[in-house]
């Protein structure tokens, strides 16, 4: 199989599994119901977006992803949010995990967030970037490491 076809199969299988196994996340109590595939999507996002950041920075990426799941403007599953077109740049290429220790850290932190061990350190952010360019209609909630986090202006 070509790498593009393999990637498409991966995305479709993760999305289908997510749809079948995960209910929409409307509040923090439902975050605890994430399936193994949802945790994997959350861990991959944290790894690829923040592997060079501190735990605090990686936690902020995890919380931003979960905040999107809770917001009705985004897909209702973690995998749906992570693989939504043009949202997480790394998904376009689906790179392999190369630093196993960093991935293990991302997975541990994702599981800890799901278990309720870490409060949202982004103040409800739905967006982040490393360019310090504020998306229109948003306000910066916090800067952690090389990322700035934003939420919509109400």
Residue ranges and their predicted role:
Residues 8-15:
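Bacterial N-terminal signal peptides
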Residues 17-19:
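N-terminal signal peptide c-region/cleavage motif recognized by signal peptidases
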């Amino acid at each position: 199989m070509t790498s593009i076809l393999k990637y498409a199969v991966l995305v479709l299988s993760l999305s289908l599994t997510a749809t079948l196994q995960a209910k929409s996340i409307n509040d923090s109590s439902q975050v605890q119901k994430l399936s193994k595939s949802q945790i994997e999507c959350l861990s991959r996002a944290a790894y690829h977006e923040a592997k060079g950041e501190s735990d605090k920075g990686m936690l902020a990426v995890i919380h931003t992803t979960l905040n999107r799941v809770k917001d009705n403007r985004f897909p209702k599953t973690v995998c749906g949010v992570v693989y939504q077109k043009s949202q997480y740049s790394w998904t376009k290429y689906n790179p392999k995990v190369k630093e196993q220790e960093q991935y293990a850290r991302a997975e541990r932190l994702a599981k800890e967030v799901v278990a309720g061990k870490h409060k949202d350190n982004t103040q409800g952010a739905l967006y982040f970037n490393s360019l310090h360019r504020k998306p229109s209609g948003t306000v910066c909630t916090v800067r952690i490491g090389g990322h700035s986090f934003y939420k919509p202006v109400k």
